[in-house]
């Protein structure tokens, strides 16, 4: 079977400035200890070391650099919880390839959200117990309308996690637009945007949230997160046998090679950059612009730049010995040194172009 050998990533830029939360250094060690406490029952020692090496508290401090000091620890905990949850439901050797088991796993979290009898009871140091604690905090601390939006987003997130396993099992091929639209609606991006708003200590009026430019700038930020994550996580997902990725969708649906798929994804990312700047300028000149709106749209930009920086640095995508390219201009070559020994649901030949070099 023919396999990819490498693909080049042209310069990845992000217009919004990179910022880090001022409490980052203080919180990082504390949050690492917290990660060990809640993740250990679910993980082997090796998995635990890998989990800590992902620098998730650092990611959170770049995603939410302007969050209130009292709220940033809860945002860090949510990001850490979701990352471990996501790893479990995307594991193609387990839940990620078994729709029935994935649905049952997600069902336990749905019970917690809906407040089923006994659902909030702690279960040791488990992932579910961690989520129950987080959810109780958000339920008690968020304004009612903001909490209702959180419920909708997280229910969609769980729905997407379960349906992803079904799509893998069926060998479904999505176009790039279908893939992005699905992730945009149900991925973690929409939840993170809402948590960013909560972290600022504001609740935007529904009238403001429904403004076309506000909706568009949030969508643009989420699309940027999708493009960045999928291009920089492709290598580790490919080597694990996971083809639920934007690059894979482009290859399979269009019959193009991996380099072309990477280039298309980078072009989408650049479109997001340009669109964000245009929308930011438009909103600052609007009649509904306010200090709260300014914090919100700036926060979206910080999420974009923070996610790009972390995605280049994290061991989650590149391994613990990874040395990232130059800080000012992220670019490089992703090597696939060890071709996977498996038969994917959708044969590799179906989407490897003859133009690919090996």
Swiss-Prot record:
Entry GO MF terms: terpene synthase activity
Q: Name one GO biological process term.
A: isoprenoid biosynthetic process
What sections of the sequence does the record tag as coiled-coil?
none
Pfam families linked to this entry: Terpene_syn_C_2
Q: Which family does it belong to?
A: Belongs to the terpene synthase family.
Q: What does this protein do?
A: No terpene synthase activity detected in vitro.
**Which PANTHER family does the entry mention?**
BETA-PINACENE SYNTHASE-RELATED, TERPENE SYNTHASE
**Other remarks on record?**
Selaginella moellendorffii contains two distinct types of functional terpene synthases (TPS) genes, the typical seed plants TPS genes (SmTPSs) and a microbial type TPS genes (SmMTPSLs).
Spell out the protein name for this chain: Microbial Terpene synthase-like protein 13
**Source species of the chain:** Selaginella moellendorffii
